[in-house]
Amino acid sequence: MGKWWFNSIEGLEHRCGLSKSMDSLGYLIGNTSGSEDPTLNDTNKNIPSWGHSGSYSCNNVDHFFSVRDIWSFISDGTFLVRDNNGNCYSVYLDIENQVFEIDNDSSFLSELESSFSSYMNSSYLNSGSKSDNRYYDRYTYDIKYSWNNHINSCIDSYLRSEINIDSYISSGSDNYRDSYIYSYICSGESVSNSKSGSSSIRTGGNSSDFNRRGRSNDFDLNKKYRHLWVQCENCYGLNYKKFVSFKMHICEQCGYHLKMSSSERIELSIDSGTWDPMDEDMVSMDPIQFHSEEEPYRDRIDSYQRKTGLTEAVQTGIGQLNGIPVAIGVMDFQFMGGSMGSVVGEKITRLIEYATNRSLPVIMVCASGGARMQEGSLSLMQMAKISSASYDYQLNKKLFYVSILTSPTTGGVTASFGMLGDIIIAEPNAYIAFAGKRVIEQTLNKTVPDGSQAAEYSFHKGLFDPIVPRNPLKGVLNELFRLHGFFPLNQNSSRALGSVICSEL
């Protein structure tokens, strides 16, 4: 295996408009024929030349199969090409680590060609139509979309995302979404039309298309790029991870509200520097000694604690919302599906009792699959315990409780404190139900209509009050609190409240 390193300043300056030169960067993938500025350090191998011309033409390299279907192999990071002498090469391109590898393993390539020949007699080939693939005309032997242009487009997209992304944010440009990296990291459209475990190869004309379809579901991003992108569950579009938080985890393509962690919701709602958590050291102790065949309950709790950095499926504490002191609890669906066990119930109950004693408004952000089955009837008792504390808070003390329902809110949470708010707010398109769709269909053997458990449907049936997107949510809460007589503290009152909280926690 030969390995070469490549750098990229000239193409970077040309594409991203950088005025400051970086000495550590050179040309984009280019001259391998030993000219003045070789970018590949090892030139002992006789590799077909990819000239460093203005058009980055690649006329002496043929497609072994089309660019569109290459993205089915993105996990391997490998391109397959053949030169005009009939020699086949596998090309590995790792933009992040600046690695460019070429191999001519004849055994692997001959095995692949045998797969082509065996597939030519298959029924799929006879029934397949080139017109069914809308990428066929664009990516098959098209000089405009040659191999070099494709690779340079990949590098373009990476450079934009890593180096020049601030200019896209400030200008509000959406051009980065047109890049190859953005469009084809996840072969969403081709995968969605395939069944898991099947494989197919399509050949015809002057080119060959190779499709390997074996992904378990349409939502899986390749592991190699999950640190860069967040995929929308609604439109399958990709959102750049570095600034998805600035967009409040709202999909830029369709406006769908993506899932958020409890820490992200606290950061969104609570003023910076005012958050004081409560009962952080409270953890579950496996009260009924529940052991499944897969893993013990305690081991599962430990794994979720390491994964999320949380001790339980809810965070509770005191903070300020536009200067107004509030008691807030935020459930986290990433921790065992936000399930409600004895610790979750105890933390919420203590939060409400503290707010009752301090006459603070309460916000509960719900995201849960319901009661935690690993704790049996003890988890069901939390419904009554929280409801009892809420009754004293709302009816006896006449204080103000706001419930925010996010996706999903189901089971025991829906049947208890989730629906007890003086004002019940739902996020757009939130999944809100008591029993889930799959449970209903398997129990009653009836089909649940699509959208019947969405927030918009429940809103028209009068199940809750407003549907509020994340963008204006903090302002809406601020107006509600002022309407009910809760106002921002002055600096002296704020310091006094902070000292009282610290002394009691």
UniProtKB/Swiss-Prot annotation:
GO terms for molecular function: acetyl-CoA carboxylase activity; ATP binding; carboxyl- or carbamoyltransferase activity; zinc ion binding. Residues 189-213 are annotated as: Disordered. GO terms for biological process: fatty acid biosynthetic process; malonyl-CoA biosynthetic process. Residues 228-499 form the CoA carboxyltransferase N-terminal domain. It catalyses: N(6)-carboxybiotinyl-L-lysyl-[protein] + acetyl-CoA = N(6)-biotinyl-L-lysyl-[protein] + malonyl-CoA. Acetyl-CoA carboxylase is a heterohexamer composed of biotin carboxyl carrier protein, biotin carboxylase and 2 subunits each of ACCase subunit alpha and ACCase plastid-coded subunit beta (accD). Component of the acetyl coenzyme A carboxylase (ACC) complex. Biotin carboxylase (BC) catalyzes the carboxylation of biotin on its carrier protein (BCCP) and then the CO(2) group is transferred by the transcarboxylase to acetyl-CoA to form malonyl-CoA. This is Acetyl-coenzyme A carboxylase carboxyl transferase subunit beta, chloroplastic. The lineage of its organism: Eukaryota, Viridiplantae, Streptophyta, Embryophyta, Tracheophyta. The gene is accD.
